[in-house]
């Protein structure tokens, strides 16, 4: 072979379909396992749902314009760790679980009820089953890996044919060669092993694969001597290696990608040699061509995904659109949808291209377990993919013969099986998985055909799920911002705003802070702005909620400066603050004003204390202790009686400042030490903490404020990014907006005081990263346009208002279900002296109903339109219809005339007459 031969796949394009072609309204979940979390046959797709032990089942192709219906199959009493479809029977599914068993299921045709029990049960094993794969040539043979053991099963007898020699550590991956003769494994002991299971249980070959013991995978190429492995090197960089089993001491070639902590999922099509690499928790697919003969791993294309990938699978080659030159199709599993991503080779003609689509393995097995174990190496007959020459043989495995299925009845709670549901179109939005101790196993859940039972199974949906965020018109922007300080500490929001103005730290020396008037949008002058000069670098700043003209600024000199901005705005440079608070001995982290008491301010510092100040007196009144490391964030409870902190020492604390300087409660916080934030939610009954896990994945943790020691009630993993998510909570709607500095996406979740705790809503995405994102007071919202949140987005050179609205049909009515009475947050409920003396206040409430608008709850019901019988529409025609028919007839009559045209009778002139 010419090593410089040009590849026919060099122009391959990855195409993402429009959202209408996505399989939406799903609730996907991921388990801590080595599986891919989604698999496909030529007819069905199976994927992990957010209920432990439950799979979602959906047809691969839609029938006409009907929406694909998602059903749910309760498989196990614990997490489903891996799954696989038979290569010969599209409706035979095998599942592996953390309950240490393997089950085989006969799935019905679309429209029929799912089975209430498995067709076969294998196991139990000594550990949770991590890997599962059917044999490529023999029906009824499959391998499973659990702990350090790998078994090859004769499923017809429900007995293992052999158990391979024990590995040195956890088996992370296992795969059959294409001819079914060999079996390869990757292990946490960093060894890559090749077995001939029919010859001996010991490894025929073994070699060090990847220098790091993190998650490793392998897949075989179309040529049985070659395989591809993925893993990590000693520098924690992700790498891909191509191996030849005949020269197994070293890899033929290797490829280093990046230092992402996410393991790579290799998806290889043996016929084309195209290799797709997908990282869980990422939003990008890499496509390479594996060419063992050269040898090389040649890059083909990259695809940037619209959502985070939770799992990935290849669609069988027999299900591809060959006339459209679709050479590969990847199914991306995200939290809320399954996205089919097609890889096409551009060709000028619409025809079947033999060079792109060689014959592929058919769906009729070559042997059975007995014949294969006896030594048969007969291969599966290959079939043409040409639509005109394609045979359509059908094969039904004997492992789980089809039976006459009847709708399953609800099973009593506690049974390991019995989870079934009739097909129904899921219209509620997906809710991310909450992996906290409050979510128990769903193995005993039963369903009835009623929609109410289905909704109770799937959980509630948020009325804000269709929220729409949009940047307001440019006339409301403040532009030409220059010299912003983008290096404020991670504990600070970066800027602050109230209903009148915005305070933004500048990069210039002297700790300067610019104050911009929101009522005066437009382009700022090119000349220097009047500023507040603090003399030292600014670490945090906050507006007094009860005095819109007072700004508190914390500096690196451990001092807090209080500035008073004139009512008409800052007209000149101010160098003398109204007051200076001293007491901290180290740099200050953050500032938080009391939500109800006037002149009360809390501050945290590198001296590991939280101090509470009486601004009227200008002195420290209370000091909170007990922190052993950096304080990431603090927050007052809505009633102002308690204060919560989250710390780098991995602890979450609640204080009663007026009662004791020591914490009232302590509990485990986020595992990661990169940063965290805390906010009180659900009327002060819960604490929401945003932070990182041990793998640097951003996550949300929800704690009961009365039981911190018990750990989080729910945990939600989001994505991998370096910046801490900054939460902005709206107590009126129960919505939290989350984004980080440098992000382009704002997450929206509705928080519930019970399971499922998190209800996902539409997120807001911007084309470029923002430097800060702050929620404005509720009174800034345009209630008539059903605007439930107004925010400010800080960009590199501008400040933009962002409105979040809810689509409603009858906007002429006041949407009282969206706008309850709101707290008058700009009026104090008591003084600092009263609060420090032990008194508690209650805030006043204010209705947001505009004058002259009627609440939608009191709106008269619209009478349904009377519909005429269909015969009326068939027999009667309107005047407009009659006119259109007459014009069409006239045009048709004129168009059918074949008389010669006038210009046809004209005679031309000789060429010499033109001179």
From Swiss-Prot:
BP GO annotations: actin filament polymerization; Golgi to endosome transport; protein transport
Q: Does the keyword Oxidoreductase apply?
A: no
The protein's name in its UniProt record: Coronin-7
**Annotated SUPFAM superfamilies:** Quinoprotein alcohol dehydrogenase-like
Q: Under the cellular component aspect of Gene Ontology, which terms does the record hold?
A: cytoplasmic vesicle; cytosol; Golgi membrane; trans-Golgi network
Q: Which Pfam families match?
A: DUF1899 (PF08953), WD40 (PF00400), WD40_4 (PF16300)
| Record key words, sorted | Actin-binding, Cytoplasm, Cytoplasmic vesicle, Golgi apparatus, Isopeptide bond, Membrane, Phosphoprotein, Protein transport, Repeat, Transport, Ubl conjugation, WD repeat
Q: Which GO terms describe its molecular function?
A: actin binding
**WD repeats: from-to residues:** 75-115, 124-163, 166-205, 209-253, 533-573, 583-623, 626-665, 719-759
- As annotated, the Glycyl lysine isopeptide (Lys-Gly) (interchain with G-Cter in ubiquitin) covalent link is placed at 463
Region: Disordered; residue ranges are 396-456, 850-915
- InterPro entries, sorted: Coronin, DUF1899, Quinoprotein_ADH-like_sf, WD40/YVTN_repeat-like_dom_sf, WD40_repeat_CS, WD40_rpt
Out of the domains of life, which is the source? Answer: Eukaryota
Recorded hits in SMART domains, A to Z, give: DUF1899, DUF1900, WD40
* Family recorded in the similarity comment: Belongs to the WD repeat coronin family.
Q: Which residues carry this modification: Phosphoserine?
A: 453, 456, 905
Task: Quote the PTM field.
Answer: The membrane-associated form is phosphorylated on tyrosine residues. Ubiquitinated via 'Lys-33'-linked ubiquitin chains by the BCR(KLHL20) E3 ubiquitin ligase complex: 'Lys-33'-linked ubiquitination promotes interaction with EPS15 and facilitates actin polymerization at the trans-Golgi network, thereby facilitating post-Golgi trafficking. Deubiquitinated by ZRANB1/TRABID.
- Please indicate if the UniProt record lists Protein transport as a keyword: yes
Give start-end positions of Basic and acidic residues composition bias: 874-886
Record PROSITE patterns: WD_REPEATS_1, WD_REPEATS_2, WD_REPEATS_REGION
Compositionally biased spans, kind Low complexity: 399-413, 420-450, 859-869
Question: Where is the protein found, in the record's own terms?
Answer: Golgi apparatus membrane; Golgi apparatus, trans-Golgi network; Cytoplasmic vesicle; Cytoplasm, Cytosol
Q: Quaternary structure per UniProt?
A: Interacts with clathrin adapter AP1 complex. This interaction takes place at Golgi membranes and not AP1-positive endosomal membranes. Interacts (when ubiquitinated at Lys-463) with EPS15.
Q: What does this protein do?
A: F-actin regulator involved in anterograde Golgi to endosome transport: upon ubiquitination via 'Lys-33'-linked ubiquitin chains by the BCR(KLHL20) E3 ubiquitin ligase complex, interacts with EPS15 and localizes to the trans-Golgi network, where it promotes actin polymerization, thereby facilitating post-Golgi trafficking. May play a role in the maintenance of the Golgi apparatus morphology.
């Amino acid at each position: 072979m010419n090593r410089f031969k040009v590849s026919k796949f060099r122009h391959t394009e990855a195409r993402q379909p429009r959202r209408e072609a996505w399989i939406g309204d799903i609730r996907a979940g991921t388990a801590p396992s080595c599986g891919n979390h989604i698999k496909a046959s030529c007819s069905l797709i199976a994927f992990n749902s957010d209920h432990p032990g439950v799979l979602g089942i959906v047809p691969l192709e839609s029938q006409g314009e009907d929406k694909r219906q998602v059903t749910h199959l309760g498989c196990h009493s614990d997490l489903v760790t891996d799954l696989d479809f038979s290569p010969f029977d599209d409706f035979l599914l095998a599942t592996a679980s953390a309950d240490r068993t393997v089950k085989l299921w006969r799935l019905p045709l679309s429209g029929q009820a799912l089975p209430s029990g498995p067709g076969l049960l294998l196991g139990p094993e000594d550990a949770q089953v991590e890997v599962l794969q059917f044999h490529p040539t023999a029906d009824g043979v499959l391998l499973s890996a659990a702990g350090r053991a790998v078994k090859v099963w004769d499923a017809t007898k429900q007995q293992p044919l052999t158990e391979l020699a024990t590995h040195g550590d956890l088996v992370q991956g296992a795969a059959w060669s294409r001819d079914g003769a060999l079996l390869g494994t990757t292990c946490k002991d960093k060894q890559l092993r090749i077995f001939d299971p029919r010859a001996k249980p010991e490894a025929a070959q073994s070699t060090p694969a990847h220098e790091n013991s993190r998650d490793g995978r392998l897949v075989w190429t179309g040529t049985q001597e070659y395989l591809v492995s993925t893993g990590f090197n000693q520098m924690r960089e992700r790498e891909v290696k191509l191996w030849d089993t005949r020269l197994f001491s070293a890899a033929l070639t290797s490829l280093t990608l990046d230092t992402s902590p996410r393991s790579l999922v290799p998806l290889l099509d043996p016929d084309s040699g195209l290799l797709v690499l997908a990282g869980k928790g990422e939003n990008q697919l890499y496509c390479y061509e594996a060419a063992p003969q050269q040898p090389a791993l040649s890059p083909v294309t990259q695809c940037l995904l619209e959502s985070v990938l939770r799992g990935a699978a290849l669609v069988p080659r027999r299900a591809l659109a060959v006339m459209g030159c679709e050479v590969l199709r990847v199914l991306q599993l995200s939290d809320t949808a399954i996205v089919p991503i097609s890889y096409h080779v551009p060709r000028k003609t619409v025809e079947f291209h033999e060079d792109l689509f060689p014959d592929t393995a058919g769906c009729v097995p070559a042997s059975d377990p007995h014949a294969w174990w006896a030594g048969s190496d007969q291969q599966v007959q290959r079939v043409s993919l040409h639509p005109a020459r394609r045979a359509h043989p059908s094969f039904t495995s004997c492992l789980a013969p089809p039976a006459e299925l009847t709708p399953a009845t609800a099973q009593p709670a506690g049974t390991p099986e019995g989870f079934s549901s009739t097909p129904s179109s899921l219209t509620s939005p997906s809710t991310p998985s909450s992996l906290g101790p409050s979510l128990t196993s769903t193995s005993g859940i039963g369903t009835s055909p009623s929609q109410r039972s289905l909704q109770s199974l799937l959980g509630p949906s948020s009325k804000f799920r269709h929220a729409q965020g949009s940047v307001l018109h440019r006339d409301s922007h403040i532009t030409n911002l220059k010299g912003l300080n983008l290096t404020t500490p991670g504990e600070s929001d970066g800027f602050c705003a109230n209903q009148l103005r915005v305070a933004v730290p500048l990069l210039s020396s002297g700790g300067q802070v610019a104050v911009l008037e929101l009522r005066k949008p437009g382009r700022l002058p090119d000349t220097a702005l009047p500023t507040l000069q603090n003399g030292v670098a600014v670490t945090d700043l906050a507006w007094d909620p009860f005095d819109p003209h007072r700004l508190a600024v914390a500096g690196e000199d451990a001092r807090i400066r209080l500035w008073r901005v004139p009512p008409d705005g800052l007209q000149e440079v101010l160098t003398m603050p109204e007051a200076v608070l001293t007491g901290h001995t180290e740099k200050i982290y953050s500032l938080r004003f009391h939500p109800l008491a006037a002149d009360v301010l809390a501050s945290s510092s590198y001296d590991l204390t939280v101090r509470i100040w009486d601004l009227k007196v200008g002195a420290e009144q209370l000091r909170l202790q007990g922190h052993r490391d950096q304080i990431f964030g603090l927050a007052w409870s809505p009633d102002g009686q308690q204060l919560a902190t989250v710390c780098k020492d991995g602890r979450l604390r609640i204080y009663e400042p007026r009662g004791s300087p020591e914490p009232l409660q302590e509990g485990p916080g986020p595992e990661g030490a990169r940063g965290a934030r805390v906010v009180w939610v659900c009327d002060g009954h819960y604490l929401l903490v945003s932070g990182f896990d041990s793998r640097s994945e951003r996550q949300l943790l929800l704690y009961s404020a009365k039981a911190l020691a018990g750990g989080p009630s729910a945990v939600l993993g989001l994505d991998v990014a370096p910046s801490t998510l900054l939460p902005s909570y709206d107590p009126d709607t129960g919505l939290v907006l989350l984004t980080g500095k440098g992000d382009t996406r704002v997450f929206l979740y509705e928080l519930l005081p019970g399971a499922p705790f998190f209800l996902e809503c539409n997120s807001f995405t911007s084309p470029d990263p923002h430097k800060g994102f702050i929620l404005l007071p509720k009174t800034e919202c345009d209630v008539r346009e059903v605007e439930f949140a107004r925010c400010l987005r800080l960009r590199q050179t501008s400040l933009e208002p962002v409105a979040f609205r809810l689509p409603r049909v009858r906007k002429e009515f006041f949407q009282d279900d969206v706008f309850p009475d709101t707290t008058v947050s700009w009026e104090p409920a008591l003084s600092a002296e009263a609060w420090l003396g032990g008194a508690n206040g209650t805030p006043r409430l204010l209705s947001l109903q505009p004058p002259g608008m009627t609440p939608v709850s009191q709106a008269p019901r619209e009478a349904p339109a009377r519909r005429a019988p269909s015969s009326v529409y068939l027999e009667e025609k309107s005047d407009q219809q009659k006119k259109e028919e007459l014009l069409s007839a006239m045009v048709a009559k004129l168009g059918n005339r074949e008389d010669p045209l006038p210009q046809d009778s004209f005679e031309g002139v000789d060429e010499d007459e033109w001179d």
